[in-house]
């Protein structure tokens, strides 16, 4: 089974093409976890780096026409070297341009997983869910949204919210761990996309277990951070979350996981 120990042993190089707001937080989070991040954004450099990579994250948060071309180039190179790519279609339900870019990347390039909140994933499959920018309202049918997207795209899907859902090959599991402090720190969702990219390629054919482990590690680390002194304050939580990602073990995951 995919484990945190395996990630630390392999220390996969993860290329993160992510939004400008969260680059530092993302890099520090991956280092704490045990992965090796690179924030490269130039196609010639990506050609050199991706041949050694264990994962690629495409996060469309700070979207421009130039970045769209960069995403396309990176995904072409990743497919060339069989590097699993994860798409985070940030705010794709908030406007036509973002939806157009997300649709292009999903329909024309090879993806190993898509990670988004309920509003984002629902917009990709035409389900009506209230969404405001990068945030979405709580929904009761998050597992149905995950399954609908998995069926439509035949790609593993992670839908995040108060409850998280993972759908792979028509099978769905829900994760009931996490911290209410996470939405109060900008970048926690974006870092999660990078964590998913770190785990997804560890074991071929074990995508469901890999995604489940990624989500549990991340969410339980959030619970650990919130319980620490002043962890209920967003500034302290941000620091303690990085610390928790560094300290969490497979034993913690086994003890505290809540999966249905």
From Swiss-Prot:
Which transformation does this protein catalyse, written as a reaction?
5-(2-hydroxyethyl)-4-methylthiazole + ATP = 4-methyl-5-(2-phosphooxyethyl)-thiazole + ADP + H(+)
Q: Name one GO molecular function term.
A: hydroxyethylthiazole kinase activity
CDD domains on file: THZ_kinase
Q: Which InterPro entries does the entry mention?
A: Hyethyz_kinase, Ribokinase-like
Q: Which residues bind ATP?
A: 115, 160
Q: Where does substrate bind?
A: 39, 187
Give TM segment ranges.
none
Which terms are listed as keywords in the entry?
Answer: ATP-binding, Kinase, Magnesium, Metal-binding, Nucleotide-binding, Thiamine biosynthesis, Transferase
Cofactor entry: Mg(2+)
One Gene Ontology BP term is: thiamine biosynthetic process
Give the pathway: Cofactor biosynthesis; thiamine diphosphate biosynthesis; 4-methyl-5-(2-phosphoethyl)-thiazole from 5-(2-hydroxyethyl)-4-methylthiazole: step 1/1
Could you say which EC number(s) this protein's record lists? 2.7.1.50
Purpose? Catalyzes the phosphorylation of the hydroxyl group of 4-methyl-5-beta-hydroxyethylthiazole (THZ).
Q: Which family does it belong to?
A: Belongs to the Thz kinase family.
User: HAMAP family attached here?
Assistant: Thz_kinase
Tell me what this protein is called.
Answer: Hydroxyethylthiazole kinase 1
């Amino acid at each position: 089974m995919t484990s945190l120990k395996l990630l630390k042993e392999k220390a996969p190089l993860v290329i993160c093409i992510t939004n400008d707001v969260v680059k530092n937080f993302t890099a520090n989070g991956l280092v704490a976890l045990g992965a090796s991040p690179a924030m490269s954004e130039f196609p010639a450099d990506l050609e050199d780096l991706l041949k050694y990579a264990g994962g690629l994250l495409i996060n469309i948060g700070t979207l421009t026409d130039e970045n769209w071309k960069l995403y396309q180039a990176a995904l072409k190179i990743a497919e060339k070297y069989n590097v699993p790519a994860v798409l985070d279609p940030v705010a794709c339900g908030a406007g036509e341009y973002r939806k157009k870019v997300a649709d292009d990347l999903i329909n024309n390039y090879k993806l190993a997983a898509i990670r988004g909140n309920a509003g984002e994933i629902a917009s990709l499959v035409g389900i009506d869910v209230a969404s405001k920018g990068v945030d979405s309202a709580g929904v009761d049918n998050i597992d149905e949204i995950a399954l609908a997207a998995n069926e439509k795209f035949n790609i593993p899907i992670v839908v995040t919210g108060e409850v998280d859902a993972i759908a792979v090959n028509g099978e769905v599991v829900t994760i009931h761990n996490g911290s209410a402090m996470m939405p109060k720190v900008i970048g926690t969702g974006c870092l999660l996309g990078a964590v998913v990219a770190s785990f997804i390629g560890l074991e071929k054919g074990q995508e469901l277990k890999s995604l489940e482990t990624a989500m549990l590690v991340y969410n339980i680390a959030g619970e650990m951070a919130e319980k620490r002194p002043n962890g209920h304050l967003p500034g302290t939580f941000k620091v303690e979350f990085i610390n928790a990602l560094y300290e969490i073990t497979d034993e913690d995951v086994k003890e505290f996981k809540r999966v249905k």
